[in-house]
């Protein structure tokens, strides 16, 4: 009798209510269950878990992969800044696309190239032999090597010349690492463009291919030429400094700023514009130095945290984690600010050079 009453009762219920009934038991609302008030209300500021660092899911996946690879904290902070820049540029591109812009697909192609560089730079491209290029700041040691016999020879000559103090050798080593990174990015870009052209040749008809090579591919090769020019200028500078030592009248010390200043001097800028750019570069270099300081502090905090965890001091671990998290957040913020400023300065110089052409 009882089962018959139950069946009769169930037939009288609406379909949706039946579905909810059979999905039970329901978690209590106070625990944030699936159907609690908290879960159904919009969340204006969701908690940033490891998988919620970015608005774009593919970038979250890359971030999670990097964490699984246990990259050093400074490298992770650098990657975070690179992914933030990538996300900003991709979201801006989506707005352009909605407005019917980027018809030739060049901006989209540049975004893909930039992402490929990031993947290769941090060893996230799935290649077992991926060379993780160190950033300009701290993580590269002299034991890492420079991957180029010419650079190795120059560096050995500089070290044994007696022309450099310990501080100057550290500065010169950062310049060598910066050059190594530029070469690596050039090679990644070259490989990406080679794959792109192969795809076009295999898929697109010859008539369509001629139009593409006349616009998109041409601009991509222009980018390659600019990077190669920068590499050659950098190598000339390394040769000069390695043989002569540092000049007491040097304008700048940070490798990225030196590159920008060299490009600015050969760009189509008036004396007034060049002087204004020089002043802006001074502020930019100060910003980089501040970022480098926080990177050093983050490395120290990371070592202290590892030591505290190894001895099992709970209170000390708690304090160390708090300081580590604070420095990590600040390093990420400054890294993004530096990269954003660098992108802006590089773009302005590039446009000035194109206007000259």
UniProtKB/Swiss-Prot annotation:
Region of interest called Disordered, as start-end residue ranges on this chain: 32-52
Annotated keywords: Coiled coil, Endoplasmic reticulum, Endosome, Glycoprotein, Golgi apparatus, Heparin-binding, Phosphoprotein, Signal
Record annotation: effect of changing residue 304 to A: Reduces competition with MAPT for binding to LRP1
Consequence recorded when altering residue 291 to A: Strongly reduced interaction with LRP1
Composition-biased stretches (Basic and acidic residues): 35-52
Record's keyword annotation contains Coiled coil: yes
Residues that bear Phosphoserine: 50, 135
Motif, Prevents secretion from ER: chain positions: 354-357
Record note on what altering residue 290 to A does: Reduces competition with MAPT for binding to LRP1
Glycosylation sites: 268
Any matching Pfam family: Alpha-2-MRAP_N
Residue segments, region LDL receptor binding: 237-353
GO biological process: amyloid-beta clearance by transcytosis; extracellular negative regulation of signal transduction; negative regulation of amyloid-beta clearance; negative regulation of protein binding; negative regulation of receptor internalization; negative regulation of very-low-density lipoprotein particle clearance; positive regulation of amyloid-beta clearance; regulation of receptor-mediated endocytosis
A cellular component term, taken from the record's GO annotations: plasma membrane
Family: Belongs to the alpha-2-MRAP family.
Disease: Myopia 23, autosomal recessive: A refractive error of the eye, in which parallel rays from a distant object come to focus in front of the retina, vision being better for near objects than for far.
Quaternary assembly: Interacts with the LRP1/alpha-2-macroglobulin receptor heavy and light chains; the interaction is transient and coincides with a reduction of ligand binding by the receptor. Interacts with LRP2/glycoprotein 330. Interacts with LRP1B; binding is followed by internalization and degradation. Interacts with LDLR. Interacts with SORL1. Interacts with LRP1; this interaction is followed by rapid internalization.
Function, in words: Molecular chaperone for LDL receptor-related proteins that may regulate their ligand binding activity along the secretory pathway.
Name this polypeptide is given: Alpha-2-macroglobulin receptor-associated protein
Gene that encodes the chain: LRPAP1
């Amino acid at each position: 009798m009882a089962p018959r009453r139950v069946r009769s009762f169930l037939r009288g219920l609406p379909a949706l209510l039946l579905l909810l009934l059979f999905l039970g038991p329901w978690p209590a609302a106070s625990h944030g269950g699936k159907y609690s008030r908290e879960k159904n209300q919009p969340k204006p500021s969701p908690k940033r878990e490891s998988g919620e660092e970015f608005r774009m899911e593919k970038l979250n996946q890359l971030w999670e992969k990097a964490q699984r690879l246990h990259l050093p904290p400074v490298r992770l902070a650098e990657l975070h800044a690179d992914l933030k820049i990538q996300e900003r540029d991709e979201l801006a591109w989506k707005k352009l696309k909605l407005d019917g812009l980027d018809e030739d697909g060049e901006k989209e192609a540049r975004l893909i190239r930039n992402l490929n560089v990031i993947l290769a730079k941090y060893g996230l491209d799935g290649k077992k032999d991926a060379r993780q290029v160190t950033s300009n700041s701290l993580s590269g040691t002299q034991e890492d090597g420079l991957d180029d016999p010419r650079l190795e020879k120059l560096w050995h000559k500089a070290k044994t010349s007696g022309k450099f103090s310990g501080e100057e050798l550290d500065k010169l080593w950062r310049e060598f690492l910066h050059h190594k990174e530029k070469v690596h990015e050039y090679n990644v870009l070259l490989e990406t463009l080679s794959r792109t052209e192969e795809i076009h040749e295999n898929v697109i008809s010859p008539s369509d291919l001629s139009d593409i090579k006349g616009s998109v591919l041409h601009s991509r090769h222009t980018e390659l030429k600019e990077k190669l020019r920068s590499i050659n200028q950098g190598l000339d500078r390394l040769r000069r400094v390695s043989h002569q030592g540092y000049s007491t009248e040097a304008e700048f010390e940070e490798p990225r700023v030196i590159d920008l200043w060299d490009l600015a001097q050969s760009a189509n800028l008036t004396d007034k514009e060049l002087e204004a750019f020089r002043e802006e570069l001074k502020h930019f270099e100060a910003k980089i130095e501040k970022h480098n300081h926080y990177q050093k502090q983050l490395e120290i905090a990371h070592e202290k945290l590892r030591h505290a965890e190894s001895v099992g001091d709970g209170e000390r671990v708690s304090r160390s984690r708090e300081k580590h998290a604070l420095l990590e957040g600040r390093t990420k913020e400054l890294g993004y600010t530096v990269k954003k400023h660098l992108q802006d300065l590089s773009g302005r110089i590039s446009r000035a050079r194109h206007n000259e052409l």
